[in-house]
């Protein structure tokens, strides 16, 4: 709660959040400013005098926790500290208000480490609609019925199972989650063009090292992404 409240205070003070960085110098300068401002706001909250309101829906929160527990129930291996070896996280967002209405950061023992917004993992093919296809459609050059050629790329990715289908529609390429087509599309529209879409959606683990890297098309990021992103 303190973390989110500190960010809210930063927004109220017109702090300019940044998600895309030109280079290391740009990133370092921003992070120095961010950390100083964040620490100041978090300390203000801990000093008292604030009333914090959340958008969490307790019924949805309970349902999400139950669903996570049920899905992972077959995996019972425990670590030495008594926590489950296999963990998970989940978030529900109200798309009308963009508010987080439920957030689950794990299962089992009580844990202050909330994996839903603190832990980053590689998104794999789940990122394709966001960084490849949606930006490509917005260019007007790509549309669901357009044909693209699915073939093996030198120094590029292969498809799951090693199969290639030749000329396929963009719709079919997305349906089959073809890595080669996703790579081709992002390379064609420009990696940084697609990356900027994630910046506009406020993905918070992006780094300057990701700039121009075509493996982003199939979910290969430097830091990964968070569930809440």
Annotate each language-model stretch with its function:
Residues 130-133, 183, 195, 228:
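Predominant activation on well-ordered alpha-helical scaffold segments within soluble catalytic domains
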Residues 118, 178-179, 203:
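A broad detector of the eukaryotic-type serine/threonine protein kinase catalytic domain
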Residues 205-229:
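Active-site-proximal helix/loop microenvironment
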Residues 1-160, 171-172, 218-225:
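Extended, non-catalytic substrate-recognition/exosite surfaces adjacent to catalytic cores, especially
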Residues 190-206:
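Short, charged, amphipathic alpha-helices and their helix-cap/turn boundaries
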Residues 42-46, 174-177, 207-211:
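Short, flexible turn/loop "capping" segments at secondary-structure junctions
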Residues 141-195, 213:
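Conserved catalytic neighborhood of penicillin-recognizing serine enzymes
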């Amino acid at each position: 709660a303190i973390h989110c409240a500190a960010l809210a205070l930063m927004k109220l003070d017109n702090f300019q959040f940044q998600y895309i960085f030109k280079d290391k110098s740009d990133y370092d300068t921003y992070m120095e400013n961010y950390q100083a401002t964040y620490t100041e706001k978090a300390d203000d909250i801990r000093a008292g005098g604030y009333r914090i309101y959340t958008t969490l829906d307790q019924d949805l929160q309970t349902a999400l926790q139950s669903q996570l527990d049920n899905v992972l129930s077959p995996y019972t291996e425990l670590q030495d500290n008594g926590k489950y070896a296999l963990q998970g996280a989940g978030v529900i967002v109200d798309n009308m208000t963009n508010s987080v209405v439920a957030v689950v950061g794990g299962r089992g023992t009580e844990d202050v480490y909330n994996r839903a917004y603190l832990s980053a993992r590689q998104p794999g093919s789940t990122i394709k609609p966001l960084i490849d296809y949606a930006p490509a459609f917005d260019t007007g050059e790509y549309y669901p019925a357009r044909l693209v050629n699915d073939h093996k790329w030198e120094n590029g990715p292969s498809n799951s199972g090693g199969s290639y289908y030749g000329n396929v529609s963009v719709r079919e390429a997305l349906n089959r989650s073809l890595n080669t087509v996703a790579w081709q599309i992002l390379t064609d529209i420009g990696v940084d063009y697609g990356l900027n879409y994630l910046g506009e959606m406020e993905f918070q683990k992006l780094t300057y090292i990701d700039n121009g890297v075509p493996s982003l098309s199939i979910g290969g990021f430097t830091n990964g992404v968070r569930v809440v992103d």
